[in-house]
A protein has these predicted regions:
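ATP-binding pocket architecture of kinase catalytic cores
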Residues: 9-14, 34-161, 169-181, 196
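Short linear X-Pro dipeptides
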Residues: 16-17, 27, 174, 179, ...
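Juxta-kinase regulatory segment immediately upstream of eukaryotic protein kinase catalytic domains
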Residues: 1-31
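Short glycine/proline-enriched coil/turn segments at helix->beta-strand junctions
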Residues: 53-56, 85, 216, 241-244, ...
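Helix-rich C-terminal or lid/interface subdomains of diverse kinases
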Residues: 6, 42-45, 116, 226-232, ...
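Active-site acidic catalytic loop and adjacent metal/ATP-binding pocket
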Residues: 45-52, 58, 91, 186-236
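Short, surface-exposed alpha-helical segments at coil->helix boundaries
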Residues: 18-22, 74, 245, 249
Length: 300
């Protein structure tokens, strides 16, 4: 029997609208019942997020699989926050399932900032060093009792072999369009790179939308739904997906990343990018163009 975890079926997402959120808030948190509710401009996939007044947000999982992260975030984000050099969301309240919404949910403070992008970052090297400093601090938090990789975070922080089947399917679809030989070599190197087995805290989804900027500088890190303790190589993927070449080098130096961890991090970036390229190939939208750009970065 294989010991490699299975990702399972694609989650069946449900929709959530502002009226549902108003009812949940009124029923469970009457002190906030009069506050206006409106969707956040750039919502995520795993959760529907709504402004609750001007200073809070309600965050509601879109599927049962994503709801597994609620208890973890409620338990651990207050532990992590005082040990990190940048603000992270700390829950203000935990909501319960209601008549027309079946999952636990959360209320958080609203953290100001705009999502990071290469165009918005003022100084790419400083941004990379600041991000590395945040991740270094996260890795230093005592992992005793922390959640290991599992269904709550799609096995981030575990073995890359969990994603081998997805990666191979993407490579087959992209054959003849990209340098799949190079991609296969990078993937094999990542799979063969050994982890030292020392559990460290990781974020699990260090990406543009989860890094907030103020005046071009990193000011907050959000969305810890995939966090846990295990192999932190998954957090290295951002070195290729967002950072410049100079920033990538500064990031690696600040974190003192060894060859094996770097190779696995490159593999995490490759998996996500290949899957996106395969899904969007032939499209002219921003997501497709960005995935092709990142694939070039990974191959250099």
């Amino acid at each position: 029997m294989s010991t490699i975890p299975s990702l399972g079926a694609v989650p069946r997402r449900r929709t959530v609208d502002a009226d549902q959120v108003r009812r949940l808030v009124a029923e469970q948190f009457p002190q906030w019942a009069g506050l206006p509710v409106r969707p956040v401009a750039r919502g995520g996939w795993d959760n529907f997020t709504f402004h609750l007044g001007d200073t809070m947000v309600a965050r509601l999982p879109s599927a049962a699989e994503y709801a597994l992260a609620v208890e973890k975030e409620q338990r651990w984000l207050p532990v992590l926050a005082p040990r990190l050099p940048l603000p992270i969301p700390v829950p203000l309240a935990e909501g319960k399932p209601g008549p027309d919404y079946p999952f636990a949910w959360s209320i958080y403070p609203w953290l100001e900032g705009e999502p990071a992008s290469a165009e918005r970052v003022a100084d790419p090297v400083r941004f990379a060093v600041d991000l590395a400093g945040f991740l270094a601090a996260l890795q230093c938090v005592d992992p005793t009792g922390a959640p290991p990789p599992g269904k709550h975070n799609w096995f981030r922080g575990g073995t890359l072999r969990t994603y081998d089947e997805q990666t191979r399917r993407a490579l087959a679809k992209l054959d003849g369009h990209v340098d799949t030989g190079l991609a296969r070599d990078i993937w094999k190197t990542a799979l063969d790179a050994r982890w030292d087995g020392v559990d460290r805290w990781f974020h699990g989804d260090v990406a543009e939308g989860n890094l907030l900027l103020g005046q071009g500088e990193l000011t907050a890190v959000i969305d810890f739904g995939t966090c846990g303790a295990g192999d932190p190589a998954c957090d290295m993927a951002v070195a290729w997906t967002l950072l410049t070449a100079d920033g990538r080098q500064a990031f690696r130096e600040r974190l003192s990343v060894d060859e094996a961890t770097w190779a696995r991090g490159r593999g995490w970036a490759l998996w996500k990018t290949l899957v996106t390229c395969a899904r969007t190939w032939g499209s002219a939208d921003r997501e497709a163009g960005e995935a092709r750009r990142v694939l070039v970065e990974i191959g250099q």
